Amino acid sequence: RQRQMCIRDRYNGFLFGVLFLSLWAARTHRPLLCAALFASLLQLKHIYIYVAPAYFVYLLRAYMLPSLPTSASAVSAAIDRTIKLGAATLVPFLLSILPFVLDAMRDVSYETNVLYAMYTRLFPFHRGLMHAYWAPNVWALYAAADRVLLRLQHQTLASTSRGLVGDTVMGALPNVPPSTCFALALSLALVYVVPLWRKPSYTRLVVCVTLCGMASFGVGWHVHEKAILLAALPLGLVAHRRYV
């Protein structure tokens, strides 16, 4: 068990290294490299999709549309940048997904289709709202309130986290579906990207990544306690600018 946790921690450390490389590319004004690195990061672990709105808005405003095109040449240049950015983003996806797509085209049955198997493993909605190693977030308070209401109603107390893959069932309060979690996280992300849209910069990108990571930790689905690293580690890159 300890060896398994050690391997997992090293893997997560490697992923944060790729995240920091993408932020370094943004800091050194290399938007295409930034896009390619972040697209590769999404292929390595899809949990980073929570911070994708920050990258999308930054690359859109800092590279594709630094200003509104007002002439034919400016429009042509914007289209050229869009094509380059699209290629830098899509190539990592194609390199990793295309072999599976070709294999799935030869096998259309759901039981053995590799794309269907990937989907069920990447998005395990059956695992429930709270992880066994639950995060101290909004849903922890929600589950605590559910337990209090159950005690007040003198009902049998149900478990809100049954092992690593157990489902979460509330007793008094309504159950929370995955769509609600994603809608809340996306709504918060849309608020956080507004300053980045108005004035795209490296510092604002890092702050936006931090806030999006915090949103995923606070209201995400099946959040592990270590998911706080998605907010805490990027924050370290700009913390000295605000407190020193």
Q: How would you describe each model-predicted region?
A:
Residues 20-33, 59-66, 238, 242-243:
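Membrane-interface transmembrane helices that cradle and orient dolichyl/undecaprenyl
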Residues 21-22, 32-52, 212-220:
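Membrane-interface alpha helices of multi-pass inner-membrane proteins
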Residues 133-218:
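Aromatic/glycine/proline-enriched transmembrane-helix motif characteristic
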Residues 39-43, 52-61, 232-238:
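Hydrophobic transmembrane alpha-helices of multi-pass, membrane-embedded glycosylation machinery
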Residues 8-12, 224-228:
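Short acidic/glycine- and proline-prone juxtamembrane loop motifs at membrane-interface regions
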Residues 2-7:
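Short, small-residue-biased leader/transition segments that mark boundaries at the very start
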Residues 225-244:
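Hydrophobic/aromatic-rich transmembrane helices and adjacent perimembrane loops
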